[in-house]
């Protein structure tokens, strides 16, 4: 048979059927699994290189997640009808898959591994990211590549006080929590979430619920592997020569590294570490030992020294204890012409954050497989090489920048006012000007301040803190506000953002096999203390949103017109709306329900547009006074343009009090006059009067003048 190695496993999971299949598609890959959940179908493949590239001192794992438009029965929009560079969501999902599987490869494994996940069908109800993570885990487990899995994953919602397993797209929209987690049988490896100010207890409960919920998936992968797994690759054990080299590196470097890590300032510390490393490698080269292997051993020795110092003495690299947050300085309004700005400095980490307010025309149009939609809140995170004192690539954002920006986006998004209350498009740019750990959390703090400086009515400020973990057999330590070195050498990156009322975002990545609920609870409680401290420091700069938007920002006025009048405002081919825009200098957005948003740089501009639109959608009222312009004069009176594009006749008898010999004696073409609508003639034409209006003040003086004005005896009717 052609597909004699085809195997299938299915289970009921979260009210829907999860199906895992292998042996039929992509059979030349080391591992390939087709996973279906509802009508969402993905293909995950895994291929590993059989040899290590010379000089390779890291694990080259690549994860590529791709959404095909045909999966939802669509053709890509735009000029090119083919999927191109990865979208933001594809990049984020690639990272989502990468993060829980990376820690489960053996220490010292250097073979290149590539995971590719393609979305083949999307039912627009079941999100493909969870299915993709499960499929990738299954493909790795079957591949024979050394992998200490399998990994399970789930999405958790929170509606009406109840946790929901794998909520549908419609349920996610009404949920107060959107949490994705992944892990093994023993514990959790990765968490990513957006929440509406939930308590630490609720967040921990969601993680515990999710960990239990994906255990059947792990069991299904194990059962599939019992039938379909390939023979495991042999693991290369450390040779006697490598053990001797590691001992020699320890002998040459330990004391020098201890002294270097006693330096509290980052730049000076790195210079001393670099000097120790150069001396060690020079000695080893003279002894004709492997310098490339020694570099990795040097990193491991660094980790050992830092980790044990923290566990034994409770003292960190920069001299702090495990709970202390670095000194903070928050400033707002630092850039004169921007709509909102903030400079947030925490130790040697600094973010310059700028907020810009725009109109609906500035919204990001996203062409996704579900269809086109618009995004009104944009957050862009930039990490230039100078922020860490290095040279490097400058250009389009990398995966890390996209991921950090989205993390900060999730932290702020639940607090944003609705479009009906604040009809602006918001773009925030975070420029990381210095970095020594927690730059994404500095972005959260800076974004909160910059938005409030711009007048965005956030109900409460938002702050974020990054937590770390050092875990050995002899104990563990949870670290508040970690440095870059503590991130690299530690076992956990645990980021929590929120307000004084609760958590808005939580992201966790574990570099060891898993952590316990006890450690996670300690980290959450410690993070809350740190977050409240940071909020207190931020309040010294700004306690809440400014009363109004910046003078440099557009003023948006919202008016409503009847739906059947929209065509009158737009005009044939957009002729009328273009004329209004040109006349007023405003940006105007018209929605299908008759809502019109007018963005102007001054109140005068906005009023000009409002008056013109009102004139098109409303009827002038008898007895009301209007400002108009004389457009034509005749023997029998003057024609006045008023109420937008309306024209009316001021009969010669209504031009002024007393006798008027000639129309031209009172008005000329182009004069601005104040008129009162006094009725319609038998042909429906508007009749106006100037004589009953005080031309200086615009006041109605009907009761002060006679019923009829003067006129020429030969004036035409």
Curated annotation (Swiss-Prot):
SUPFAM superfamilies: Eukaryotic type KH-domain (KH-domain type I), Nucleic acid-binding proteins, Ribonuclease PH domain 2-like, Ribosomal protein S5 domain 2-like
GO molecular function terms noted in the UniProt entry: 3'-5'-RNA exonuclease activity; magnesium ion binding; polyribonucleotide nucleotidyltransferase activity; RNA binding
All residue ranges annotated as the S1 motif domain in the record: 623-691
EC number: 2.7.7.8
First-level EC class: transferase
Protein species of origin: Acidiphilium cryptum (strain JF-5)
Alphabetical GO biological process terms: mRNA catabolic process; RNA processing
Protein name: Polyribonucleotide nucleotidyltransferase
Cysteines joined through disulfide linkages: none
InterPro entries to which the protein is assigned, alphabetical: ExoRNase_PH_dom1, ExoRNase_PH_dom2, ExoRNase_PH_dom2_sf, KH_dom, KH_dom_type_1, KH_dom_type_1_sf, NA-bd_OB-fold, PNPase
GO CC aspect terms: cytosol
Keyword list, A-Z: Cytoplasm, Magnesium, Metal-binding, Nucleotidyltransferase, RNA-binding, Transferase
UniProt catalytic activity: RNA(n+1) + phosphate = RNA(n) + a ribonucleoside 5'-diphosphate
Subcellular location: Cytoplasm
Domain of life, source organism: Bacteria
Residues where Mg(2+) binds: 487, 493
Main localisation: cytoplasm
Family membership: Belongs to the polyribonucleotide nucleotidyltransferase family.
Cofactor(s) demanded: Mg(2+)
Record domain KH: where: 554-613
Function statement: Involved in mRNA degradation. Catalyzes the phosphorolysis of single-stranded polyribonucleotides processively in the 3'- to 5'-direction.
């Amino acid at each position: 048979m052609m597909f004699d190695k085809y195997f299938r496993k299915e289970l009921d999971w979260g009210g829907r059927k999860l199906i895992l299949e292998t042996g039929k598609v992509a059979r030349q890959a080391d591992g390939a699994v087709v996973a279906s959940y509802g009508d969402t179908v993905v293909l995950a493949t895994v291929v590993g290189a059989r040899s290590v590239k010379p000089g390779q001192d890291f694990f080259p794992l690549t994860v590529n997640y791709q959404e095909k438009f045909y999966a939802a029965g669509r053709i890509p929009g735009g000029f090119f009808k083919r999927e191109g560079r990865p979208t933001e969501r594809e990049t984020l999902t690639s990272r989502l898959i990468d993060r829980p599987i990376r820690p489960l490869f053996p220490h010292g494994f250097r073979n290149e591994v590539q995971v590719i996940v393609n979305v083949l069908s999307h039912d627009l109800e079941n999100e493909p990211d969870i299915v993709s993570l499960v499929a990738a885990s299954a493909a790795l487990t079957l591949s024979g590549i050394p992998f200490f899995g399998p990994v399970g994953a789930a999405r958790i919602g929170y509606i009406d006080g109840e946790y929901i397993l794998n909520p549908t797209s419609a349920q996610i929209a009404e949920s107060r929590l959107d949490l994705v987690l992944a892990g093994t049988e023993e514990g959790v490896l990765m968490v990513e979430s957006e929440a509406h100010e939930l308590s630490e207890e609720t967040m921990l409960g969601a993680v515990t619920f999710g960990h239990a919920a994906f255990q059947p998936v792990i069991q299904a992968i194990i059962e599939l592997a019992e039938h379909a797994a390939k023979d495991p690759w042999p693991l290369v054990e450390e040779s006697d020569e490598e053990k001797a080299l590691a001992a020699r590196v320890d002998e040459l470097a330990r004391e020098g590294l201890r002294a270097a890590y006693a330096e509290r300032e980052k730049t000076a510390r790195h210079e001393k570490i670099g000097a120790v490393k150069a001396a060690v490698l020079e000695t080893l080269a003279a002894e004709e030992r492997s310098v490339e292997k020694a570099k990795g051993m040097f990193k491991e020795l660094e980790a050992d020294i830092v980790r044990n110092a923290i566990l034994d003495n409770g003292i960190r690299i920069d001299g702090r204890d495990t709970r202390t947050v670095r000194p903070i300085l928050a400033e707002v309004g630092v850039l004169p012409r921007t709509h909102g700005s903030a400079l947030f400095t925490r130790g040697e980490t600094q973010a310059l954050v700028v907020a810009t307010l725009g109109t609906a025309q500035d919204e990001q149009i996203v062409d996704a497989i579900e269809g086109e939609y618009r995004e009104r809140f944009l957050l862009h995170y930039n990490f230039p090489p100078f922020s860490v004192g290095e040279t490097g690539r400058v250009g389009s954002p990398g995966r890390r920048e996209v991921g950090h920006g989205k993390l900060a986006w999730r932290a702020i998004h639940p607090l944003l006012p609705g479009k009906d209350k604040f009809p602006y498009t918001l773009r925030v740019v975070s420029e990381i000007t210095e970095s020594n750990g927690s730059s994404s959390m500095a972005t959260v703090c800076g974004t909160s301040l910059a938005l409030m400086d711009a007048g965005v009515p956030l109900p409460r400020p938002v702050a974020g803190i990054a937590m770390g973990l050092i875990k050995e057999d002899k104990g563990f330590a949870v670290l508040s506000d970690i440095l870059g070195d503590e991130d690299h050498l530690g076992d956990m990156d645990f980021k929590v953002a929120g307000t004084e009322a609760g958590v808005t975002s939580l992201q966790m990545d574990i570099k060891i096999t898993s952590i316990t609920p006890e450690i996670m609870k300690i980290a959450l409680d410690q993070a809350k203390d740190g977050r409240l401290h940071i909020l207190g420091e931020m309040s010294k700069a700004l306690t809440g949103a400014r009363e109004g938007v910046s003078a440099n920002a557009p003023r948006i006025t919202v008016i409503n017109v009847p739906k059947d009048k929209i065509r009158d405002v737009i005009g044939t081919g957009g002729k009328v709306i273009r004329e209004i825009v040109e006349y007023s200098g405003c940006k105007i957005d018209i929605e299908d329900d008759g809502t019109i948003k007018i963005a102007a740089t001054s109140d005068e501009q906005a009023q000009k547009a409002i008056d013109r639109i009102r004139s098109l959608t409303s009827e002038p009222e008898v007895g009301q006074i209007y400002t108009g312009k004389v457009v034509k004069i005749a023997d029998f009176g003057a024609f006045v343009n008023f109420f937008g594009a309306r024209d009316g006749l001021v009969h010669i008898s209504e031009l002024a009090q007393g006798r008027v010999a000639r129309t031209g004696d009172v008005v000329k073409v182009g004069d601005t006059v104040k008129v009162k609508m006094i009725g319609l003639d038998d042909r429906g034409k508007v009749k106006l009067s100037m004589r009953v209006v005080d031309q200086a003040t615009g006041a109605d003086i009907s009761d002060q003048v006679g019923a009829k004005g003067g006129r020429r005896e030969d004036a035409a009717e």
